[in-house]
From Swiss-Prot:
Name this polypeptide is given: UDP-N-acetylenolpyruvoylglucosamine reductase
Catalytic EC class: oxidoreductase
Disulfides per UniProt: none
Family named by the database record: Belongs to the MurB family.
Signal peptide region: none
One Pfam family hit: MurB_C
Gene3D superfamilies in UniProt: 3.30.465.10, UDP-N-acetylenolpyruvoylglucosamine reductase, C-terminal domain, Uridine Diphospho-n-acetylenolpyruvylglucosamine Reductase, domain 2
Organism, as annotated: Streptococcus pneumoniae (strain 70585)
Lineage, opening ranks: Bacteria, Bacillati, Bacillota, Bacilli, Lactobacillales
Keyword Transcription regulation: no
Top-level taxon: Bacteria
Length: 301
């Protein structure tokens, strides 16, 4: 029995797509094929896929909403698991529990509807709840670490564990999940009671700032670089004269130099080449070495 036949038998009922192009699932609109793209409907299907992959020695990875990643043009070998169907969100008092595939922006709107404050900073951050925990996503002075109460994960060995914020060892755009290989299943956020109008005004203000400053009208991977201590990446790139700098179909945004946008059928290689070139030119200009925030996954073509 071939691996494919065994997969279809053991994982019967689970949505699996073979040699599926990933560009249509990525905010950058680039990326090659996944060998097996899987859409589990719940944590039990997810656990079945992980167990099968481990037994068959097939590599696997989970993607959130693919908002802060670049998938290389050669694609990704093994299983790519998209958890967007694991998207239930519930409210209990001042606590919101969200599954990993829940949309982060929509989760902040649920907090607003229940007049819960603390989540406003994330009202414009694209991506999933699971991805936000993985990266300790943040903006405008807030970050996931500030509001996370606990996190349920599936370990790489297939066990379910509940972790505290301390267990996750949050840092700037970092969590312990990045090293552990665990998969976020669900998250509990501890919020506080607030006034609906005040929360909405703050969310509207932050949304306006984002629309004003960021090139939301183009495909992009979000913030490309981490913020250097004492500096802003976008400012350093701008001061190096790189706004509008382009390689292939990808260019440094004129609107915000911290973003690289796909303006003309760019490729993942265009992104990688532009990122490396910007790092080198900023280093030459300011002496500061930018560190990449965006994750680059898969194989080159």
């Amino acid at each position: 029995m071939s691996v494919r036949e065994k997969m279809l038998e053991i994982l019967e009922g689970i949505d699996i797509r073979f040699q599926e192009p990933l560009h249509s699932y990525s905010y950058t609109k680039v990326g090659g094929e996944a060998d097996y793209l899987v859409f589990p409907r719940n944590r039990f299907e997810l656990a079945r896929v992980v167990k099968f992959a481990n037994q068959e020695n097939i590599p696997w990875m989970v993607l959130g909403n693919a908002s802060n990643i670049i998938v290389r043009d050669g694609g990704i070998r093994g299983f790519v698991i998209l958890c967007d169907k694991l998207n239930n969100v519930s409210v209990d008092g001042y606590t919101i529990e969200a599954e990993a595939g829940a949309n982060l922006i929509e989760t902040t709107r649920i907090a607003l509807r229940h007049s819960l404050t603390g989540f406003e900073f994330a009202c414009g951050i694209p991506g999933s709840v699971g991805g936000a925990v993985f990266m300790n996503a943040g903006a405008y002075g807030g970050e996931i670490a500030h509001i996370l109460q606990s996190c349920k994960v599936l370990t790489k060995d297939g066990e379910i564990e509940t972790l505290s914020a301390k267990d996750l060892a949050f840092g700037y755009r970092h969590s312990a999940i990045q090293e552990s290989g665990a998969v976020v299943l669900s998250v509990k956020f501890a919020l506080a009671p607030g006034t609906h109008q005040v929360i909405k005004q703050e969310m509207d203000r932050l949304t306006h700032l984002r629309e004003l400053k960021q090139p939301l009208e183009y495909p992009s991977c979000g913030s490309v670089f981490k913020r250097p201590v004492g500096h802003f990446a976008g400012q350093l790139i701008s001061e190096a004269g790189l706004k509008g700098y382009r390689i292939g179909g990808v260019e440094v945004s004129e609107k915000h130099a911290g973003f690289m946008i796909n303006v003309a059928d760019g490729t993942a290689k265009d992104y990688e080449d532009l990122i490396q070139s910007v790092i080198e030119k900023v280093k030459e200009h300011s002496g500061i070495t930018l560190e990449r925030e965006v994750r680059i996954l898969g194989e080159s073509k």
